Amino acid sequence: MSSGRGSRIPEYWYGQVPVPPFMRFMEVIYAGAVSLRRLAYRRGWRRRYGVAVPVVVIGNLVAGGTGKTPLTIEIVARLREAGWTPGIASRGYGRRDLKTPRWIQPDTPIELAGDEPAMIAWKTGMRVRVDVDRSAAACALVAEGCDIVVCDDGLQHYRLMRDIEIEVIDGQRRYGNGHLLPAGPLREPMVRGRLCDFRVLNAGQYSDRPTSGFGPGDWQMRLHIDHAQSLQGSRRRSLDAFSGQRVHAVAGIAHPERFFSMLRQRGIGVVPHAFPDHHFYRAEDFTFGSRLPVLMTEKDAVKCRAFADDWFFSVPLRVELPTVFWTALFDRLERLVSC
C-alpha cells in the first residue's frame, strides 16, 4: 500500500468520471483568458523580449510533470559535448522566495533553489538561473557567457522569445480528458502542440513494443534505470543487487507510480511512499517502521542529502531518444547560428 501522501489529482482529469458542471463553467472563463493573453502577445499589445543567442524552451501543455527535467538535463549534456556553453533558465517552482532571482549552485539550499533547478545544477554543473521572469533569466545567462539558453518549462511564458519549442507529453496519460483547467489538466488547447518544433512522448521504461497513439511528428523518449547511488559517499550499486528484496520506494513527483513500476520491473519488492510533487522532506517523513533500503528519484534525493544515512539511495534516470532526433535538433541549431 502507498503511504497515501501523494498530491490529489481530480478523478475526472484522467478517468471516466464526468466533469462537474461548475468546472465546465470555469473552463470557459479560463479558455477566454488564455486566448486573450496569446492574442495580446501576437498583436504586440504585450511586449516580448529576446536575447542574442538561441533559446530552446522545453515544456508541456498539461499541469504537472511529464519528464521535462530529465530531457533538459540530457539536452544540456549533449550541447556541452557539441561545444556549446548552455545556461538553464527556470522559474524555480517550490522555492520559498519566488520573487528573488538567484544563481543556483549544486550546494544552494533547496528552499532557495527549488528541487528541479537544484537537480539540474547538481547533474550538469552548468549555470542555472531561477527567475519568475524567464526573459530576465535568459539575459543574465547570456551576460555570464552562455551561448545558448535552455528553459526548463516555460512553454506558456510568451514574454521570452524562443527559437525552438519542445513539447513533452506523458505517453501514458497524454492529455487526459482533453479539457482545459480546471475541468481537465490542459494549460492550453491541444492544438497548441502542433506549433512546437518537436513533440517528445515520454514512454517510460524501454520496451520493444511500439507505444500506441504516436503520430508522425512525435519522438519517443524512453527512460532507463540500472543502478542506485548512495546519498552518502560515492557507493554505487546495481539495481540487480536489490532484486528479490523489499525496499522503501519514495517519489515526490507528478506521477509516482511510474517510478514504482520501473523498480518492480527490475524484480524489486516495492513498499511505495508517494509524496506531493515538490515536497520538502524532513527526517520524520522517513519513519516507516521497518529498516529497509530507501530508493528515491534524483529529484527527491537533492532534498534529503542533509539527513540521509547509508540506507538512502537515488536512482538516476537515463534518457534515450532516436539518433535522428538529435540530428534534427542540432541541424536546426546550426541553421539558427548560420543565419
Swiss-Prot record:
The metabolic or biological pathway listed in the UniProt record of this protein is: Glycolipid biosynthesis; lipid IV(A) biosynthesis; lipid IV(A) from (3R)-3-hydroxytetradecanoyl-[acyl-carrier-protein] and UDP-N-acetyl-alpha-D-glucosamine: step 6/6
The domain of life is: Bacteria
Recorded family membership? Belongs to the LpxK family.
As its record notes, the protein acts as a catalyst of: a lipid A disaccharide + ATP = a lipid IVA + ADP + H(+)
- Give the molecular function GO annotations: ATP binding; tetraacyldisaccharide 4'-kinase activity
Identification of the protein by name: Tetraacyldisaccharide 4'-kinase
Q: Is Nucleotide-binding among the key words of this record? A: yes
Pfam families linked: LpxK (PF02606)
Record InterPro entries: LpxK, P-loop_NTPase
Record's keyword annotation contains Ribonucleoprotein: no
- Give Gene Ontology CC terms: plasma membrane
BP-aspect Gene Ontology terms: lipid A biosynthetic process; lipopolysaccharide core region biosynthetic process
The protein's Enzyme Commission number: 2.7.1.130
Keyword set, alphabetical order: ATP-binding, Kinase, Lipid A biosynthesis, Lipid biosynthesis, Lipid metabolism, Nucleotide-binding, Transferase
Q: What class of enzyme is it?
A: transferase
HAMAP family hit by this protein: LpxK
What does it do? Transfers the gamma-phosphate of ATP to the 4'-position of a tetraacyldisaccharide 1-phosphate intermediate (termed DS-1-P) to form tetraacyldisaccharide 1,4'-bis-phosphate (lipid IVA).
Residues reported in the UniProt entry to bind ATP: V62, A63, G64, G65, T66, G67, K68, T69
What is the taxonomic lineage of the source species? Bacteria, Pseudomonadati, Pseudomonadota, Gammaproteobacteria, Lysobacterales
